[in-house]
Amino acid sequence: MPRIAYLGPEGTFTEAALLQMVAKGMVPGPAEDAGGFTPVRTDSTPGALSAVREGRADYACVPIENSIDGTVLPTLDSLAAGSPLQIYAELTLDVAFTIVVRPGHDGPVRTVAAFPVAAAQVRHWLAANLRDAEVVPAHSNAAAAHDVAEGRADAGVSTRLAAERCGLDIMAADVVDEPNARTRFVLVGLPGTPPPATGADRTAVVLRLVNEPGALVSAMTEFSIRDIDLTRIESRPTRTELGTYMFFLDCAGHIDDDPVAEALKALHRRCVDVRYLGSWPTESAAGAPPPRLDEATTWLEGLRAGSGGA
């Protein structure tokens, strides 16, 4: 069975996303392994990706973007640094928190354990319902449940899965300040053959550009002239020199789509470095698909054959 690394302990949203990926058959591998995996729990998202690079895991399930705070920067930075990795699948998870307490607790809540990101996403609920409680930081959403179970906090901002695993009572469910909060998770492994194109795919690259005027515009032109829909552009410092950046690009389409393949070849010629992060199916169309070039290819072949393009 595949070994899959993810942020632990048991009960995190990442584990919930991974369980759905496995149940939906999104993990590459032999048919006899379908539905099973060996968990490799780590103490951070970069740690999960390091487990893949070091051979301690076959894949890692990590968050890459959420609707409240945007891109998960530790994931981006870890994908861009170190030996190459590749994304094979993605899944979007609805995120709502569960306020947990120890069984039978009916006294005052003086302390609430919360992962800082979670605390920020439920701060209005906490102010309205537990305004006198002190928020104490937890290592993860699941760790908040463990803090409650082990008596380090009266209540915790956690997940339903963690409440079940730790045997805790639910004080409040589906807690979130912003409706429709969602997080996108990706399955990452070592470089290999991408999943087949489906017509609803995403391709991602990291670009390092020549430090000269117009370099970014020139790179973007390779997509625009081919009618490729860019769905995300983000810059991050290279961490090598002040004022130098690398650029993360997502586009609709697959490396097997001719326009995307041509754009990647052009970027390889133009850029200092192009790191391919993969082409993989999305749950729904991520932007307009790239145009088909079948008619144009037939026309060109006719010219080469001397038919005058007729």
Curated annotation (Swiss-Prot):
Catalytic activity: prephenate + H(+) = 3-phenylpyruvate + CO2 + H2O
Site (Essential for activity): 183
Swiss-Prot/TrEMBL keywords: Amino-acid biosynthesis, Aromatic amino acid biosynthesis, Lyase, Phenylalanine biosynthesis
One family name in Pfam for this protein: PDT
Prephenate dehydratase domain mapped to chain residues: 3-190
An annotated GO cellular component: cytoplasm
EC number: 4.2.1.51
Pathway per the UniProt entry: Amino-acid biosynthesis; L-phenylalanine biosynthesis; phenylpyruvate from prephenate: step 1/1
Record-level GO BP terms: L-phenylalanine biosynthetic process
A molecular function (GO) term: prephenate dehydratase activity
Domain of life of the organism encoding this protein: Bacteria
Residues in ACT domain copies: 204-281
NCBIfam families, per the entry: PRK11898.1 (NF008865)
PANTHER family assigned: PREPHENATE DEHYDRATASE P PROTEIN, PREPHENATE DEHYDRATASE-RELATED
Subunit comment: Homodimer.
The name this protein goes by in its record: Prephenate dehydratase
